[in-house]
Amino acid sequence: MHSSIYEGTIRHRRFRPRPNRFQYRLFFMFLDLAELPTLFDIHPLWSYEQVNIACFRRRDHFGDPTIPLDQALRDLVENHLGIRPNGPVRLLTHLRYWGHCFNPASFYYCYDRADTKVETVVVEIHNTPWRERHCYVLGAEHNEHPSKNWRRHRFTKEFHVSPFIDFDIQYDLRLRQPDDSIRVHMIDYEKGEKLFDASLALEKRELNRRALTRVLFRYPLMTGKVVTLIYWQALRLVLKRTPFFSHPKKKST
């Protein structure tokens, strides 16, 4: 089995014009898409495409829900890069818990045929309250990191996420290839100056019946917690009189 659980912390830091910082513990599922249909047969409270306390629902993730996620993701990469992934595809994400799912960011790692290195990373972003989605497809040819176990991609913001960050932003994303740990670090630059960063520091846990029970009890409302903290931090920024930027579509209307 290649699927597993990753547990650790997420940290956000805003440097200007009103400093703000928070950090909290969380867990993610790391899912080999080929293993999905039978992955949760080991636990009665977890399921695939069936109502349960914890469940994977195809419609919560990228693409047409009538097309298998594995196929949809490979089609996306081929359409963007001209090369179809020919190895495993593994997804770092949240599932649906107690009927609720929200993923600020999910990461698809597309491995080579030998399953030894990540060739392409797809970052799927969701926003709230607009419930929109957008994918950044990051090919190996644009990797700027000198280490074979890390990736670095610099690219322009294309999708509205936060009303407290303007659209004219450059991203600097660094990711470590998943192994015993996962590291993700994203920096937002505005006019060449650091505005914000976000970091994930996660450690691998074996996916078994006991571990699935433990994370349900330790993080009983994982995705609800994510959304609640998003709005709590938004309130803090409002109270600090942080500048507000409307959704670009609303500006145009």
Please provide the spans of the model-predicted regions.
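Mature, function-bearing regions of proteins
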Residues: 1-253
